[in-house]
């Protein structure tokens, strides 16, 4: 943590540690050293799945593990850096910082602590982060890792908190729900009997005002503007606000399960052809 903090301060021009050249030295040298390790590993038949700023994700056969380990130890002696090793049974990667990694031992123990998630697949609520529906990554993880159908996970969940989303709007926006103005920070879930949640701001023009503008090589253009500019905060479904928790049974909440299923399946369909099995 201390090293990460220093690295950030080296590129902060308002910090006394500011040193752009040192940042480039650290990052370029680090990348070149990792590239050297990656090159050595590919020469013995390893496949580099991911190369990040601080490590490599490598796919290899058990028969060449000792050879790969020897290369890593030689690299440590040469660079005076230390490598840490984690073994995985499977990895499902959507983007560079969005993945599910199943650590060695999960298949036998089913210990949830052996599932490592990052980015969009994190199922825990993080302070300071916007709230997204945690049932979606949970359903995706159970589908890939345990073979449980997405519909079973989503429709079998009885915790309304896992369906909740939230959005905070800036001071220039007003929030409107069912023709009533709301607070700027709202918590809601997709429902079949709710209305749309809108945010709007003043455009600076009068209702029906004609605005003219010019484009190069095009004749003068004009359009009619409105006093307010509206944006739908969840276009794919109506919502129900839940800024205050209550004891209503989940069966009575009219959850739009199709919305959550669609969002989960959308990710699965993109991810499935690129999944990596490491057994």
Which sequence ranges carry the predicted segments?
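A generic structural motif
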Residues: 54-60
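Short, well-ordered alpha-helical packing segments
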Residues: 4, 31-38, 57, 68-76, ...
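Helix-rich, typically C-terminal accessory recognition domains appended to large enzymatic cores
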Residues: 40-41, 50
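Glycine-centered loop/turn motif at secondary-structure junctions
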Residues: 45-47, 79-80
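Helical catalytic core of nucleic-acid polymerases
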Residues: 1-36, 42-44, 59
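Short beta-strand
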Residues: 47-52, 85
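C-terminal, non-catalytic extensions of nucleic-acid polymerases
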Residues: 65-279
């Amino acid at each position: 943590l201390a090293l990460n903090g220093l690295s950030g301060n080296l590129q902060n021009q308002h910090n006394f540690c500011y040193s752009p050249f040192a940042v480039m030295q650290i990052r370029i040298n680090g990348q070149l050293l990792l590239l050297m390790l990656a090159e050595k590993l590919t020469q013995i038949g390893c496949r580099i799945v991911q190369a990040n700023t601080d490590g490599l994700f490598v796919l290899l056969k058990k028969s060449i593990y000792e050879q790969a380990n020897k290369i890593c130890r030689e690299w440590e002696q040469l660079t005076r850096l230390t490598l840490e090793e984690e073994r995985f049974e499977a990895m499902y990667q959507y983007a560079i910082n969005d993945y599910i990694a199943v650590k060695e031992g999960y298949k036998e123990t089913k210990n949830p602590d052996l599932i490592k998630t990052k980015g969009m697949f994190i199922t825990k609520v993080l302070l300071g982060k916007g709230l997204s529906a945690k049932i979606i990554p949970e359903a995706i993880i159970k589908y890939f890792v345990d073979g449980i159908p997405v519909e079973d996970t989503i429709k079998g969940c009885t915790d309304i908190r896992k369906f909740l989303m939230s959005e905070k709007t800036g001071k220039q926006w007003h929030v409107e729900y069912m023709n009533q103005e709301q607070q700027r920070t709202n918590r809601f879930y997709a429902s079949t009997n709710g209305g749309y949640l809108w945010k709007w701001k003043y455009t600076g023009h009068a209702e029906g005002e004609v605005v003219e503008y010019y484009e190069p090589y095009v004749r003068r253009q004009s359009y009619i503007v409105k006093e307010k500019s509206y944006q739908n905060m969840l276009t794919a479904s109506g919502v129900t606000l839940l800024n205050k928790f209550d004891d209503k049974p989940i069966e009575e909440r009219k959850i739009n399960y199709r919305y959550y299923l669609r969002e989960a399946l959308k990710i699965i369909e993109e991810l499935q052809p690129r999944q990596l099995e490491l057994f």
